[in-house]
Structures are given as C-alpha cells and as structure tokens.
C-alpha cells in the first residue's frame, strides 16, 4: 500500500466481514494499534485492542435507539465506533442514508460526547490522567 499512499501510517484495521481468528488477531496486532471486528457494542474499561466493538449503521440500525446508546455510553464511560459501507440515498443493506448518518452524528455531538478518529480515541483511552 505504501507505493499508493506514500508515508501514510495505517494504525487501524477492520476485519473483512468480521472474519476473525486467534491467528489473525495475533498477526494483525503486531501490524496495527487497533483492529475492529463486527461484534456490536460499546468499548469500555478493558479494551480488546485486537477486536474492538462497533455499531453498524446499516439497514438493521434502529435510529430510535440512538438516545439509549448514547446514554449507556456516557454511564459506562465508553466510546463507540460507528461503521457503514456506503452513504447514499438508496443504500445497500450494509449502508445508510445521508439523513441517518447526519442524525447519528448530530445526536452524538449534542450529547457532548467527543467525535474523534479511532487513533485519537485510543490515545485518550490509553493515556487519560489518573483520577483519585
């Protein structure tokens, strides 16, 4: 990939279709800071950096549950990785509409939760100040 992207340093990896194995996790954890699977959920406390959880914005996503998801994230002091395959007016079963993406981003922003790239969120999670 370096011949295409130059000096870009890739720090995260997403398992294709969520195909994860112990061998893949072992190999990829040496190549990337974090890897994301397709297991649904909020990332909290002890993070499995070789298989972070995510929330899929796809045909099955219930936009009415976003407030509950945000509330749970705040209560658990966690962070969410949202992913989708395409953003278009008539998305594939794995994508979402621009309106849904906007609604989710607006709800998260309005809640006061920071919106960050994965590597920045990881930095916050790994190097947050110790509180007493």
Regions found by a protein language model. Name each.
Residues 1-68, 72, 96, 100:
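Catalytic domains of cell-wall/extracellular-matrix polysaccharide-remodeling enzymes
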Residues 21-23, 124-127:
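Active-site-proximal flexible loops/turns
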Residues 42-43, 88, 123:
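Positions that flank functional sites
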Residues 80, 125-132:
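Accessory recognition modules or surfaces
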Residues 15-17, 117-123:
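Acidic carboxylate-rich catalytic motifs and surrounding loops in phosphoryl-/glycosyl-chemistry enzymes
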Residues 4, 56-120:
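Catalytic grooves of carbohydrate-active enzymes
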């Amino acid at each position: 990939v370096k011949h295409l992207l130059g000096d870009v340093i890739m720090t995260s990896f997403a398992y294709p279709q969520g195909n994860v194995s112990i061998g893949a996790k072992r190999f990829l954890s040496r190549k990337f800071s974090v890897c994301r699977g397709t297991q649904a959920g909020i990332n909290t406390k002890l993070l499995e950096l070789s298989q972070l959880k995510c929330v899929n914005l796809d045909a099955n996503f219930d936009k009415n549950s976003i407030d509950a998801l945000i509330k749970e994230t705040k209560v658990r002091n966690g962070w969410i990785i949202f992913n989708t395959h395409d953003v278009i007016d008539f998305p594939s079963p794995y994508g979402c509409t621009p309106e849904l993406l906007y609604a989710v981003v607006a709800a998260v922003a309005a809640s006061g939760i920071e919106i960050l790239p994965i590597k920045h969120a990881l930095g916050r999670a790994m190097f947050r100040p110790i509180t007493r």
